[in-house]
């Protein structure tokens, strides 16, 4: 499946790069400034379209060239770089430009207004145009100036055509003529500076927005590149990491790479407020730093190089000006992030294989990028509304289709931000998931129709492509696996056991997981991830699921009244996903620690390593509450006899012997006594028989001291040691903390690998 994943990734990259957004060159900004300023006084060259320049007119006609060249020379202080770029666009030499310009200036000085229209502005703000009688003079006149082309910058700065041209308001304060002027229009450029500053700010803001958007993608590309490099090194040279066990390495690992952000809680949610409404998950310290830097960069990039231009002719108020600039910036930044957040949220993400990150890590980053992106879009919508209100364009603009779709996308994004809170995901994941998909569809479609006319539609196509390919690959996995008849039963009162015949080509991944669709009328649209093991004959996968709310509860209710609490249900399987931890490759000693229903994935990885290993020390520790929990994992525990795995099971509530009747039908644990014992003695007898049947397993009653256990294991290790865990979040966090506190106990490297997939 890695080929399909690579196609998804590369196709997205190609789409993003297919048509980059419009960037404004220095000449674009100059021409935009000049043509707008000239347009206040008259029409010299007609427009050929939005944000386009009538090059034919400005390069080849006397009126167009004479007017625009005067703006370049006097308005932009004869900037040689600008003039050079203009001449390239007009396919002329710089010497020809200067000669032609000097000729026009000489004609004007010699013949006054017979050659050019001279614009002035009265004190009342109305514009007057002094025009000479139609003369036969032309640019080819023999009276053209023969002066040096390098002198006209200073010569024309005090041209007699200059007028007082004071600006009495924002925008087009004069009333421009509608007819096209056929002779050069020479204008006073004393009040030109606000135009230069304003158009430099507004047009360059688009360029900076694209640069900063690329910078945000570059930031994540850098993070991914580091992760890919580290992962490739670990895979190609697995023993190399064992040398990274010195004080400096351990210092970074103890305080940066391994620990939770705040003391212990990483897998456990933190609580704010009442009823768990503001509960959330905090990633590791390193992941938090990565996210914080991203958030800070986004905030900086949203505001850098945005400021108020005094006497800005484009906007009537400061609020309108700054609102428009911030809206453009945040909108473009948000657009750049959309394909990335879709990619990070997909199950068939090729980057998982390259980086070695698990799905939970990508989902965590997906959520944070999504939060930042939606906030950018909300700021974009608010600031544009403020700007449009200030300029009086709001009501008209909101009737346009692209604005309606933009509003739809923004509203859906806001609902996604609210609806994706941990509170809703945990309370009813199925409802959350269905609503989430619907909202995302409208968010992306609305975003496309909003952005397509602005030149940014390709970003949405990239997002759609990533999403669509992910769905196609997922459907392909399901199709080739087929609809299989699974045997589903309730074990130990709180666990579902799902046995699914698998195709021969389907390779089980140690420590992996698969998504299951139950083909029941109200359940088939839902899919849930479960870790699995395989039978000894390798013809089935066996999945275990703790009965909670939602789909597992519905299945349990369906099975409860049936004989043996068992039924055959057709299922669709999507997978496998995940991979074993690197502890088996890197460490001479591996300790697998599972809690409750976290055992299947840990067990499969442990047994897989035992089959391949010859001289590694492998230990399996399983922490359960009650004896009855053993009932649904009996076959797997018995198989451990054939391996070199040292197994220990902690029973934290051994006095609770309820549910042991499920062992009575197991031949391995039949009572050895013929006495008619009391219920209590029968239970203890059965427990004794369980221990005898699993004599290769050490049973310890009580809760383990994880910190002490880790310290002992590290001290006893004769080489690098790795801890691999999955189970209750509190236990997992406790083990993580214990490992970070014992990195320096031994001279050997100590590793920690977490297989708990927390994404709901």
UniProtKB/Swiss-Prot annotation:
Topological domains, Extracellular: 19-212, 310-324, 393-403, 452-760
Parts of the chain that traverse the membrane: 213-233, 289-309, 325-345, 372-392, 404-424, 431-451
Single annotated GO MF: ferric-chelate reductase (NADPH) activity
Signal sequence interval, chain numbering: 1-18
Keyword Ion transport: yes
Region span, Disordered: 119-177
Keyword annotations of the record: Cell membrane, Copper, Copper transport, Electron transport, FAD, Flavoprotein, Glycoprotein, Heme, Ion transport, Iron, Iron transport, Membrane, Metal-binding, NADP, Oxidoreductase, Signal, Transmembrane, Transmembrane helix, Transport, Virulence
Protein's GO biological process: cellular response to iron ion starvation; copper ion import; filamentous growth of a unicellular organism; intracellular iron ion homeostasis; iron ion transport
Domain Ferric oxidoreductase: 330-445
Entry's Gene Ontology cellular component terms: plasma membrane
Stimuli inducing this protein: Transcription is negatively regulated by SFU1, copper, amphotericin B, and caspofungin; and induced by ciclopirox olamine.
UniProt: heme 2 binding residues: 380, 450
PANTHER family xrefs: FERRIC REDUCTASE TRANSMEMBRANE COMPONENT 3-RELATED, FERRIC/CUPRIC REDUCTASE TRANSMEMBRANE COMPONENT
Name of protein: Ferric/cupric reductase transmembrane component 1
Organism field: Candida albicans (strain SC5314 / ATCC MYA-2876) (Yeast)
High-level lineage: Eukaryota, Fungi, Dikarya, Ascomycota, Saccharomycotina
Gene: CFL1
């Amino acid at each position: 499946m890695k080929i399909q994943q690579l196609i998804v990734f590369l196709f997205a990259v190609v789409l993003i790069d297919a048509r980059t957004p419009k960037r404004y060159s220095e000449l674009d900004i100059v021409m935009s400034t000049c043509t707008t300023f000239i347009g206040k006084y008259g029409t010299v060259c007609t427009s050929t379209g939005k944000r386009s320049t009538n090059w034919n007119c400005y390069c080849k006609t006397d009126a167009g060239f004479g007017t625009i060249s005067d703006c370049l020379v006097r308005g932009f202080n004869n900037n040689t770089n600008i003039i050079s770029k203009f001449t390239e666009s007009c396919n002329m030499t710089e010497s020809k430009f200067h000669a032609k310009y000097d000729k026009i200036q000489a004609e004007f000085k010699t013949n006054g207004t017979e050659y050019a229209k001279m614009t002035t502005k009265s004190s009342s703000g109305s514009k007057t145009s002094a025009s000479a009688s139609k003369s036969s003079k032309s640019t080819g006149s023999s009276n053209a100036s023969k002066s040096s082309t390098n002198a006209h910058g200073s010569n024309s700065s005090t041209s007699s055509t200059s007028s007082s041209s004071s600006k009495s308001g924002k925008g087009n304060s004069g009333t421009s003529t509608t007819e096209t002027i056929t002779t050069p229009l020479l204008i006073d450029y004393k009040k030109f500076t606000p135009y230069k500053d304003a158009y430099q700010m507004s047009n360059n803001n688009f360029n900076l927005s694209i640069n900063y958007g690329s910078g945000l993608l570059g930031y994540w590309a850098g993070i991914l590149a580091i992760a890919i490099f580290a992962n490739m090194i670990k895979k190609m040279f697995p023993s190399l990491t064992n040398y990274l066990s010195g004080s400096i390495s351990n210092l970074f690992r103890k305080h940066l790479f391994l620990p939770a952000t705040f003391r212990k809680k990483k897998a456990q949610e933190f609580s704010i407020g009442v009823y768990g409404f503001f509960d959330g998950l905090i990633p590791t310290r390193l992941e938090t730093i990565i996210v914080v830097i991203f958030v800070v960069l986004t905030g900086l990039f949203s505001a850098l190089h945005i400021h108020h231009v005094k006497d800005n002719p484009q906007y009537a108020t400061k609020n309108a000006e700054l609102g428009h600039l911030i809206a453009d910036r945040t909108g473009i930044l948000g657009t750049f992030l959309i394909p990335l957040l879709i990619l990070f949220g997909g199950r068939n993400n090729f980057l998982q294989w390259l980086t070695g990150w698990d799905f939970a890590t990508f989902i965590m980053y997906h959520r944070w990028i999504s939060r930042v992106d939606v906030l950018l879009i909300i700021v974009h919508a608010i600031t544009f509304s403020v700007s449009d209100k200030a300029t009086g364009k709001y009501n008209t603009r909101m009737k346009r289709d692209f604005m309606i779709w933009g509003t739809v996308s923004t509203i859906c994004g806001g609902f996604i931000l609210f609806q994706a809170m941990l509170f809703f995901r945990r309370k009813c994941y199925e409802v959350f998931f269905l609503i989430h998909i619907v909202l995302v569809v409208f968010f992306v479609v609305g975003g496309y129709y909003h952005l397509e006319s602005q030149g940014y539609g390709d970003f949405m196509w990239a997002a759609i492509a990533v999403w669509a390919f992910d769905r196609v690959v997922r459907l392909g996995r399901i199709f080739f696996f087929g609809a299989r008849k699974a045997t589903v039963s309730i074990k130990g009162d709180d666990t579902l056991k799902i046995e699914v015949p698998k195709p021969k080509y389907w390779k089980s991944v140690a420590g992996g997981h698969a998504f299951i669709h139950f083909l029941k009328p109200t359940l088939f649209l839902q899919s849930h991830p479960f870790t699995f093991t395989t039978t000894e004959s390798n013809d089935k996968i066996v999945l275990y699921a703790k009965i909670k709310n939602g789909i597992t509860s519905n299945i349990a209710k369906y099975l409860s009244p049936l004989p043996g609490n068992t039924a055959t249900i057709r299922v669709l399987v999507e997978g496998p996903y995940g991979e074993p931890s690197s502890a088996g490759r890197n460490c001479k000693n591996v300790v697998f620690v599972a809690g409750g229903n976290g055992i299947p994935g840990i067990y499969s990885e442990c047994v897989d390593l035992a089959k391949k290993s010859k001289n590694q020390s492998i230990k399996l520790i399983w922490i359960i509450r009650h004896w009855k929990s053993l009932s649904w994992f009996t076959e797997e525990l018995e198989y451990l006899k054939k391996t070199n795995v040292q197994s220990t099971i902690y029973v934290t509530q051994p006095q609770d012997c309820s549910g042991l009747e499920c062992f009575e039908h197991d031949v391995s644990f039949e009572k050895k006594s013929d006495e008619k014992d009391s219920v209590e003695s029968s239970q203890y007898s059965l427990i004794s028989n369980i221990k005898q049947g699993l004599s290769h397993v050490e049973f310890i009653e009580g809760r383990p001291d994880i910190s002490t256990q880790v310290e002992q294991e590290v001290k006893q290790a004769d080489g690098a040691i790795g801890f691999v865990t999955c189970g209750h979040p509190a236990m997992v966090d406790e083990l993580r903390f214990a490992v970070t506190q014992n990195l320096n106990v031994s001279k050997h490297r100590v590793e920690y690998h977490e297989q708990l997939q927390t994404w709901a």
